[in-house]
From Swiss-Prot:
Subcellular location(s) per record: Cell membrane
Protein name as it appears in the record: Olfactory receptor 4D11
Gene designation: OR4D11
UniProt keyword Cell membrane present: yes
Keywords: Cell membrane, Disulfide bond, G-protein coupled receptor, Glycoprotein, Membrane, Olfaction, Receptor, Sensory transduction, Transducer, Transmembrane, Transmembrane helix
Amino acid sequence: MELGNVTRVKEFIFLGLTQSQDQSLVLFLFLCLVYMTTLLGNLLIMVTVTCESRLHTPMYFLLRNLAILDICFSSTTAPKVLLDLLSKKKTISYTSCMTQIFLFHLLGGADIFSLSVMAFDCYMAISKPLHYVTIMSRGQCTALISASWMGGFVHSIVQISLLLPLPFCGPNVLDTFYCDVPQVLKLTCTDTFALEFLMISNNGLVTTLWFIFLLVSYTVILMTLRSQAGGGRRKAISTCTSHITVVTLHFVPCIYVYARPFTALPTEKAISVTFTVISPLLNPLIYTLRNQEMKSAMRRLKRRLVPSERE
């Protein structure tokens, strides 16, 4: 088929999470609560780290960046999902779909690289405590965060540059609630076997290997902590377990979605909801509920902002 004779699809239709109006209302209320809590939780982390001088350390500087990413990442999909749950016709233009894919992979890639930077920070703090302040200076942290965003940008450019030349001339129905490579790729009017293999290698294989690398890194860190003594050991172990939990919650759904052939499975929508909406909510909960220093800083900030709390 010659691409010049192909009529390009101008919009895609989502089947969404459910076809039932009652279920749509329940899901809307639930996901709206989750999204608002995600925004407030991550915003609270950003404000606390910014306003509390005791938290002006590399670890919290990186945590604030992760909170920014979580707000942006969830906002890429959640508002559209909420709108569609209240709409009979769930459509998205071709341009908006490609834009959503670009932002989704930019922020998702930056998130993965940022989690790697946080693992590096944790390793430096434990293995080289005397040189930690020098190695993880404010300038170095800024450079690492910038590199994380740039890595996400490059990853996203690769994804979108592979998709844009493809012809979309026939079916335009997506059995999902957001635009992503696996779903959109199945609607093209050409053979995508080689491209699918390339994207599985680029997304799935790299993500799996990166996840294994991070787990090995944290295992080394925990083994290093076993030989140390002192009051900081428990705090370091708590920090590491929080990191491991967040890494697992982020990577496992990614591996499920991208490290297999792009065929629809019954559990795909549930995993996608966890990946796109639930995970950004859990990150602030994990980092704050297990972190006494963060909770103390939030209480101090509350006393400063609410006059009655000072009494």
